[in-house]
Amino acid sequence: MGIAHTEWESVIGLEVHVELNTASKLFSPARNHFGDEPNTNISPVCTGMPGALPVLNKDAVRKAVLFGCAVEGDVALFSRFDRKSYFYPDSPRNFQITQYEHPIVRGGCVRAIVEGEEKTFELAQTHLEDDAGMLKHFGDFAGVDYNRAGVPLIEIVSKPCMFSAEDAVAYANALVSILSYIGISDCNMEEGSVRFDVNISVRPKGSKELRNKVEIKNMNSFTFMAQALEAEKHRQIEEYLSHPNEDPKKVVPAATYRWDPEKKKTVLMRLKERAEDYMYFVEPDLPVLQITESYIDEVRQTLPELPHSKYMRYITDFDLAEDLAMILVSDRHTAHFFETATMSCKNYRALSNWITVEFAGRCKATGKTLPFTGILPEWVAQLVNFIDRGVITGKIAKEIADKMVSSFGESPEDILRRHPSLLPMTDDHALRAIVKEVVAQNAASVEDYKNGKAKALGFLVGQIMKRTEGKAPPKRVNELLLAAMRDA
């Protein structure tokens, strides 16, 4: 990256499509379920049959209102649906029912931690709309699956308030956490339950100008999102630097791109349509949506504790490291697992480390996260308590953790009962002999410690633990070692 590139900044906004986990579709009684046989979850409404009239799903409305409350948005007492007209094979009606001028939620914000700094990202609006079907290609022909047609969506539109790929990914992560906590979507990005359209433009640093934006469609991976934003940022900067005297609007026209993960580049799909190209007009078959203040308050009362407030509580009440607190709260199941474990163990920092680092790493190979392995929170608490009480060493604890993950059905106590060889060394006479031997064989390190070099103590402890295969109680090792060095 040349020096000139550092004199530019990105301006980024996200449009996020979230499939709501209602039992039926937004405007019809057809089943809303992913993975069924093609064209089995359909109705005359979602296939655009003449005379079929839409009926609004009240559960979808409730979920949209709940989201509005979660992000502290202004839930509209009156909102309206519009037709967005376009022709494409996966849209049998040749229009989408959306909310163009009067969305159900305006404003709101999402708080996220970006590289240790708390940032607040503002939302423009959130609106209800129905999804399109899905084209499936088979060699020289294509089929259309209308199971997804009519699935309820909320589209969450942020303001252009992000200025780096790191900002965008942090915002997206925080948003998905909120959606998961309030339970309005399964948030399965691989199945398309959450899809990100990323808008990016660039400008010289210090400028307030908003240049033409490029939209990168259907990102379903945070890694790809970061890569795409970086690649598109540098592509646009290069275009402007290569054409310094031309009209910026012509240098980088408004367009839609896609991300090619193999070539690591954005690929042009089409130039941007204008709003008038969609011929928006009021949906004639649906009345104005009216919501009362009392209904909004009733929905607001059902909000759980949200990720950001939980994150702040973990730092203050449990004295957790910020990075581990963030990992814990990013998934509501993991957060619940941790809080259940704290009922049996008060070493909160050790608990957070075992859950987010030790067990998370071991569970990765199973394809499951810790809360879904069958390992109970009480067992992890028991493991930490055993270490703290000197029942086992840290090394033995890791061996027990390996067995807990491989068996999924045994507590540390069960494992120690079946594998007594894992119990720590209890022969104090034998341990004294090992300590005496290590001190005698490492006279230089003993002298270093006596001269104030604290690292020498760690080296000597390491030698003792090595000879005892990690089974010597660390506290007893320190006691015997310090006594032996005083006598040396």
Curated annotation (Swiss-Prot):
InterPro entries reported in the protein's UniProt record: Asn/Gln-tRNA_amidoTrfase_suB/E (IPR017959), Asn/Gln-tRNA_Trfase_suB/E_cat (IPR006075), Asn/Gln_amidotransferase (IPR018027), Asn/Gln_tRNA_amidoTrase-B-like (IPR003789), GatB (IPR004413), GatB_C_1 (IPR042114), GatB_Yqey_C_2 (IPR023168), Gln-tRNA_amidoTrfase_suB_CS (IPR017958)
Molecular-function annotations in GO: asparaginyl-tRNA synthase (glutamine-hydrolyzing) activity; ATP binding; glutaminyl-tRNA synthase (glutamine-hydrolyzing) activity
Reactions mediated catalytically: L-glutamyl-tRNA(Gln) + L-glutamine + ATP + H2O = L-glutaminyl-tRNA(Gln) + L-glutamate + ADP + phosphate + H(+); L-aspartyl-tRNA(Asn) + L-glutamine + ATP + H2O = L-asparaginyl-tRNA(Asn) + L-glutamate + ADP + phosphate + 2 H(+)
Taxonomic superkingdom: Bacteria
Pfam family, one: GatB_N
EC number(s) per entry: 6.3.5.-
HAMAP family with a match to the protein in the record: GatB (MF_00121)
Quaternary structure note: Heterotrimer of A, B and C subunits.
Protein name: Aspartyl/glutamyl-tRNA(Asn/Gln) amidotransferase subunit B
Its biological purpose: Allows the formation of correctly charged Asn-tRNA(Asn) or Gln-tRNA(Gln) through the transamidation of misacylated Asp-tRNA(Asn) or Glu-tRNA(Gln) in organisms which lack either or both of asparaginyl-tRNA or glutaminyl-tRNA synthetases. The reaction takes place in the presence of glutamine and ATP through an activated phospho-Asp-tRNA(Asn) or phospho-Glu-tRNA(Gln).
Biological process according to GO: glutaminyl-tRNAGln biosynthesis via transamidation; translation
Organism: Chlamydia muridarum (strain MoPn / Nigg)
Class in the EC hierarchy, top level: ligase
